[in-house]
UniProtKB/Swiss-Prot annotation:
Its main location: nucleus. This is Protein B-Myc. Residues 26-94, 146-168 are annotated as: Disordered. The keyword Nucleus applies. It comes from Rattus norvegicus (Rat). Keywords: Nucleus, Phosphoprotein. PANTHER family: MYC PROTO-ONCOGENE. The keyword Ribonucleoprotein does not apply. Seems to act as an inhibitor of cellular proliferation. GO terms for cellular component: nucleus; spindle. InterPro entries: Myc_transcription_factors, Tscrpt_reg_Myc, Tscrpt_reg_Myc_N.
């Protein structure tokens, strides 16, 4: 719809004021390409919200859950032949005493290494849901099959209760 400016009332100043934002006069010093004012730079207090928290310690019930035993680490550095070069555990750098005690579980009969492999495998490799379901249901299905073969009455349909008539 076209804009109609009414000149019938004779007051041209009021009419000019209604359309004045659409025109720019030569005497006005406005920068058409002026950018909007920039917000102030964020202070460092804002960035503290995004600060990474330290990793929590493992629970006391699982002291060696996240670190392999010493023997597993030593076995991974067992002597190997690489084009005539070989290295052994003697070539490993020595850590300070406390660092070794905190970093490794040195119990030779401890099964945490196997648990660590399973835990890391579950966390990082990821299994399909169907593989997990099958592995969980296999023991239950085996028990059901054994129970069905042991009891001969398992194939018989259970008896239905007689109809109950209430005398009221």
């Amino acid at each position: 719809m076209p804009l109609h400016v009414s000149l019938a009332n004779g007051n041209r100043d009021l009419d000019y004021d209604s359309v004045q934002p659409y025109f720019m006069c030569d005497d006005e010093e406005e920068d058409v390409h002026q950018q909007p004012p920039q917000p102030p730079a964020p202070s460092e207090d804002i960035w503290k919200k995004f600060e990474l928290l330290p990793t929590p310690r493992p629970s006391p019930g699982h002291p060696g859950l996240y670190s392999p035993p010493c023997e597993a680490v030593a076995a991974s550095f067992s002597p190997r032949d690489h084009d005539g070069d070989s290295f052994s555990t003697a070539d490993l750098p020595e850590l300070p005493g406390d660092a070794v005690k905190q970093s490794f579980v040195c119990d030779p009969d401890d099964e945490t290494f196997v648990k660590n492999i399973i835990l890391q495998d579950c966390m990082w490799n990821g299994f399909s849901a169907s593989a997990k379901l099958v592995s969980k249901l296999d023991p239950y299905q085996a028990v059901r099959k054994e129970g069905a073969s042991v009891s001969p009455a398992a194939d018989v349909e259970p008896a239905t209760p007689p109809d109950c008539t209430c005398n009221t």
